[in-house]
Amino acid sequence: MSAITRHGDALVIRLYIQPKASRDQIVGLHGDELKVAITAPPVDGQANAHLTKFLAKQFRVAKSLVVIEKGELGRHKQIRITHPQHIPADVADFIE
């Protein structure tokens, strides 16, 4: 399975999260997932909230359009971004 797939007007992205990183960034592929480093610690949902905000900014959508479908409590997540207005260059290469 690919890290990023299109489902109608949405993107479904399989992620591997690295919390407590030095900066927020999309790192690249990690196996069959897209690795994302975020600065927030994995405590009380802070990392999930920060991830949602970061991805919303990268794809230029409202935070409510970024939904964690699977993996709320782990590093491996599946998210859905509805109506992305912008596809970051480092992500576009991995879309199937």
UniProtKB/Swiss-Prot annotation:
Pfam families, A to Z: DUF167
A Gene Ontology term for the protein's cellular component: cytoplasm
SMART domains, alphabetized: DUF167
Gene3D superfamilies registered for this protein in UniProt: YggU-like
Top-level taxon in the UniProt lineage: Bacteria
InterPro entries noted in UniProt: DUF167, YggU-like_sf
Family: Belongs to the UPF0235 family.
Protein known as: UPF0235 protein PC1_3453
Species of provenance: Pectobacterium carotovorum subsp. carotovorum (strain PC1)
